[in-house]
């Protein structure tokens, strides 16, 4: 079952990248980045809040650093 879930997560990631790609070339203003960071977001893997510093560095992040590292390493 985990393999199916991994495949679904990878497909979701690819779809999100395709959807977001046209917008990634657009620079966000500092105010927009601040608004995203202050609004907060939950990690799509563990459900914990994504730290403000991560959202400031990557406003489009949908995983916390730890879960992103695990995902990239295939855990």
UniProtKB/Swiss-Prot annotation:
Top-rank taxon: Bacteria
GO MF annotations in UniProt: zinc ion binding
Single Gene Ontology BP annotation: positive regulation of secondary metabolite biosynthetic process
Keywords associated with the record: Metal-binding, Zinc, Zinc-finger
PROSITE patterns, per database record: ZF_DKSA_1 (PS01102), ZF_DKSA_2 (PS51128)
Keyword Zinc-finger: yes
Entry-linked SUPFAM superfamilies: Glucocorticoid receptor-like (DNA-binding domain) (SSF57716)
Zinc finger dksA C4-type: from-to: 43-67
InterPro entries in alphabetical order: Znf_C4-type_bac (IPR020460), Znf_C4_TraR (IPR012783), Znf_DskA_TraR (IPR000962), Znf_DskA_TraR_CS (IPR020458)
Protein known as: Uncharacterized protein HI_1497
Native species: Haemophilus influenzae (strain ATCC 51907 / DSM 11121 / KW20 / Rd)
